[in-house]
């Protein structure tokens, strides 16, 4: 973005740029504020450049309460997107829990992963299509199996034993290097509590 980087550091989204080539940011600009700081693992994360040239990200229950581009917003636990210049923020998909995983297939469809036994969601119609009065989930879980298979015997889990308790990544197999049976049909989902 504008020759620099965007950083999520709750309560702010920041823009940094090195202008003299010394690998240090000479420009530090607050794009907007309002991200919750009550629980750091539930804040904004997993920023990715989308097919629509917006920057997409995830947030958990720490949520967002603020104003961007003259528009007041309040949301949590789902997927959002911002314009790279920070002039606009949109909440796109409501999930049911802390959201960390975010992925796209070759068509630009959006997928996500959350905590507590919800490893894969499909994000169909965005929340923005429903208007401001609509509440509720705009993403649906599509995982057919919630279990994971760690390669180490001693894992620590506190809630969803032998299942995803922290689906923290979502990468759809899109490469022609994968077998045809994988392409656009399989997602790789990390699970930190199972060392996956």
What residue spans do the PLM features occupy?
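Beta-propeller domains with acidic blade repeats across secreted/periplasmic ectodomains
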Residues: 1-196
